[in-house]
Amino acid sequence: MAEGKSGAGLFAKQVQKHFSRAQEKVLQKLGKTVETKDEQFEQSAYNFQLQQNEGNKLYKDLKAFVGAVKVMHESSRKVAETLQEIYSTEWDGHVELKAIADSNDLLWDDYEAKLGDQALRLMENYLAQFGDIKERIAKRGRKLVDYDSARHHLEALQNAKKKDEAKIAKAEEEFNRAQVVFEELNRELREELPVLYGSRIACYVTIFQNISNLRDIFYKEMSKLNRDLYEVMGKLDKQHSSKVFIIKGVPSKRRSLLISAPVSPPAAYPCPGKAPNWEPSSGAEQTPTSPRVGSDATEDVPNGLAAPGPAEPGAPMPGPPPASPTSVRSASESESECSGESREIDLSPKEMEVSAGSGCPEYPKTEGAAKGEVEGIAASMASMIVSEAIAAATGAAPGDSDGVGGGDSTDSEISPAEGAWGGPSPGGSEERVEGTDVSPEVGSDAGPCEHGTPEPPEQDVSCNPPQDPSESLTPL
């Protein structure tokens, strides 16, 4: 019964201790209580954790290295056994070959065993001390929580309004006991952790010095065995010197090793860094070619567009000759065929484009060509006005009524200048044709006729570019 009571009391005490520790940690995380900290110990604990991680990694790699040595030992032993099996007893060096194979096996056994003892076992002993230190650090953390809990409990009793001396005395006793345990453990760890952290250097030096010495001895002894094996093979070669070792079926030059020369680009293509200059020079004057009157424009020009005639770069193009009245009439008729009577024309000074199927030529959009066109049309209009003035002065008298009166004149008798530019009828009729003023604004449309007089053909400015605004086109 006494043992049962003592066991129950110990269990209750442990439960109470765990509960008080959990409560203290929660209060510390919430900021209700102050946690005791030791910066020197925290730095030593961090170094210990780093040292432990490095040691575990090195031990893992050393274990893999020793395992590879075991695999190499087994492979070397199998190769030696196979060589002894295929080596005929009649061949020279049969006895020496068996001795070399036995020495090779013993050398591998010694190297493997010493690596395990002087490197792997030493690293295991080095890591074994980490377990005890790790547990003591965890114990120190628990004692720190007990110390903080006892201190906070004592402060709460001392700051209470109604003080109980018995409880205060008991709390002071618990606080002193927790303080002694914590400070003693904390002092020991603060002394041992820096020493343990510095011992890693001596451990690394010892391990790798042992590995270097073992490898040096192993390679020296293995070099002697390799020399002996080479001499045995030399004796066998002299014994059977008539036998020649030839590898057949291997070409001297493989296609996979030949690098073909880079393919040069064809000469017909221009250089990718230079763009061809398709535009004519700015100084050359070009005159657009008008479509043939009375012929189908679609036969010569695809998609209803007339291309300008070819011109040599840099060669000036002559302007158009002075136009006669008959030529002006034929030109106006062809222009009426191109433009149409009821269609609105969108004439942009930057884009001289026509609608599909109109058959009007599309002129090059260059400043030099536009300037030449304006000068040419101005000269044509001036010569036409002079010709009409001379014809009016010499061909018709002011009082002659036979040629102008009576309303017998037909549409075909109207002169090109009068029909196109809205001049007054020669018979003094009150019917007048509303003329179209050619203004420098290219986008304006010509107004239709108001009375029964024949409608003058519309000027397609896309075929004939706008004239110079300085020209006056009033009829004489």
From Swiss-Prot:
Domain BAR intervals: 26-242
Basic and acidic residues bias locations: 340-353
Subcellular location: Cytoplasm
Residue stretches of biased makeup (Low complexity): 325-339
Region of interest (Disordered), ranges: 269-369, 395-476
PANTHER family: AMPHIPHYSIN, BRIDGING INTEGRATOR 2
Protein name, per record: Bridging integrator 2
Source domain of life: Eukaryota
Pfam families on file: BAR
Keywords annotated in UniProt: Coiled coil, Cytoplasm
Chain intervals with Polar residues compositional bias: 279-292, 461-476
UniProt-listed GO biological process terms: phagocytosis, engulfment; plasma membrane tubulation; podosome assembly
